Amino acid sequence: MIDHRILEILVCPLTKDKLQYNKDTNELISQKAKLAFPIRDGIPIMLIDEARKLEP
């Protein structure tokens, strides 16, 4: 789970768009960039190299 206040602040490092939290995968999703950023030990990992590419 991630604090909703963090979601209001964080943006995709590539597109600068807002992110969506996926509770099933515990990831922050950038729909525009088609990337999923992992959350490890409660810390969002906002590195593009660490993001998982989403299927089109």
From Swiss-Prot:
Top-level taxon of the source organism: Bacteria
Cellular-component GO terms for this entry: cytosol
SUPFAM superfamilies (alphabetical): Trm112p-like (SSF158997)
Pfam families: Trm112p
InterPro entries membership: Trm112-like
Entry's family note: Belongs to the UPF0434 family.
PANTHER family for this protein: PROTEIN PREY, MITOCHONDRIAL, ZGC:162634
Protein name: UPF0434 protein Ecaj_0131
